[in-house]
Amino acid sequence: PSSDKNGDSGPANFWADWYNKTTQWGNIFKLTELASTAVDGIRNSKLYEEGSITMKYLLGEALTLRSLAYLELVRRWGDVPFKDGIANSDLSNVYMGKINRDSIYPFLIRDMQEAVECLPWVGEVGDYNCERVTKGFAKGLLARIALFAGGWSIRDGNQFSDANVEHYPNLENNPGMKEMNN
């Protein structure tokens, strides 16, 4: 364990006090909203509609960041508030109750499958190095989400969820598995 009691740099950020948890909760939700705003803005942009490859890459990055943030929320707090999209201007979808995490995973899987199709491999494009979200990272995150959705995340009482393990996602039909099997 880390002797640093003022930071949250331990393995998987397990050390936290009440202030730290509140800050983390707010910052992760801020990331989901910012990523959702980016996804919405990119999808509605003229450049994306005209087939800009850069906008396609940016969409993949935004989808990945949104999925990563929601997975982190679910991993840390279980059932959380979730919305698929941006906040309405009248704020009617801002203050929402939490929903079952098993209802969130299909959205994350859908987003990650789209992100995998949008992103390049590391080194495939000039500025896409290990410091950018790449196809390899997106495939790894998709696999992690699939594990959690299939029941890998243990629930209260150390029992697996009632989730259908075979359902998330069918790896043989997953576009990312072609490279893995070769």
Can you say where each PLM-predicted feature lies in the sequence?
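Short coil/turn linking the two alpha-helices of tandem helical-hairpin repeats
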Residues: V74-P81, G123, F148-G157
